[in-house]
């Protein structure tokens, strides 16, 4: 099996640039088939995908809010050895005050 694979690789590498380009030139003749394929992909993949995404957003907007878990100040979490280079130095770059606690606890929002 390895010998057959090696033989195939050596054949492909041994071809001239012109010979490698010939099999690919047949793709230019199927323009009608290509347009039909993209039209089918649009109708049967893209539009249903957008519909499923819209349904997901609708269902998530009607979802109940969860209560925040109680804050427990574990010593191995939220260690700040030096301040962050943005803002007040205590908030992470994508800090969300509703979800992410600071080292001292949740912010009152």
Swiss-Prot record:
Keyword presence, Oxidoreductase: yes
Q: Quote the pathway field.
A: Energy metabolism; oxidative phosphorylation
Question: One GO CC term of this entry?
Answer: mitochondrial inner membrane
| PROSITE patterns, per the entry | COX6A
All ranges on the Mitochondrial matrix side of the membrane: 25-34
In the record, biological process GO terms are: mitochondrial electron transport, cytochrome c to oxygen
User: Start and end of the transit peptide?
Assistant: 1-24
Positions on the Mitochondrial intermembrane side per record topology: 60-109
Q: Which UniProt keywords apply?
A: Membrane, Mitochondrion, Mitochondrion inner membrane, Oxidoreductase, Transit peptide, Transmembrane, Transmembrane helix
The record's subcellular location field reads: Mitochondrion inner membrane
Q: Where are the transmembrane segments?
A: 35-59
Q: Which family does it belong to?
A: Belongs to the cytochrome c oxidase subunit 6A family.
What do we know about how this protein assembles, alone or with others? Component of the cytochrome c oxidase (complex IV, CIV), a multisubunit enzyme composed of 14 subunits. The complex is composed of a catalytic core of 3 subunits MT-CO1, MT-CO2 and MT-CO3, encoded in the mitochondrial DNA, and 11 supernumerary subunits COX4I, COX5A, COX5B, COX6A, COX6B, COX6C, COX7A, COX7B, COX7C, COX8 and NDUFA4, which are encoded in the nuclear genome.
Q: Which function does this protein serve?
A: Component of the cytochrome c oxidase, the last enzyme in the mitochondrial electron transport chain which drives oxidative phosphorylation. The respiratory chain contains 3 multisubunit complexes succinate dehydrogenase (complex II, CII), ubiquinol-cytochrome c oxidoreductase (cytochrome b-c1 complex, complex III, CIII) and cytochrome c oxidase (complex IV, CIV), that cooperate to transfer electrons derived from NADH and succinate to molecular oxygen, creating an electrochemical gradient over the inner membrane that drives transmembrane transport and the ATP synthase.
Name of the protein this chain belongs to: Cytochrome c oxidase subunit 6A1, mitochondrial
What's the source species for this entry? Oryctolagus cuniculus (Rabbit)
The gene it comes from is COX6A1
